[in-house]
Amino acid sequence: MDDLTTIPAPVWEQAGTTNAAMRVFVGLADPTAGKPMVLYIGSLFCPYCAAARWSVVAALSRFGTFSGLSYSASSSSDVFPSTATLSFHGGRYTSQYLDFQAVELQGAELVGTQYPTLETPSDEQERLIRKYD
């Protein structure tokens, strides 16, 4: 994981910027933590979430430290089966700059016909999901 969390500044600078069209939300700092919040909502079975976690960890590692992350894989029966990833479930992020909140909604392996619930968003997280999704 060190290769992911200790990317040298010159490598970041070479990556540059793109013209990708994406929505950016700018809001006020979270008054309880006194820092801007980054909210991640995903599910372990999802291969798109699996791919996104790598860049989230790499980017946020520039501003803080992750601990307790585990290696995982997306569902073996979904599109892009068994996509390698990290799991935020049970992990922690500490930073003097950002408040990172991760919610892993469901697991990666079917139990019967459903993926098991891992975590549930708080009321505030639900409000943000409804507002920005």
For each feature predicted by the language model, list its residue ranges:
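Extracytoplasmic thiol/disulfide redox context detector
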Residues: 1-95
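Thiol/selenol-based redox catalytic cores and closely related redox-interacting motifs
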Residues: 71-133
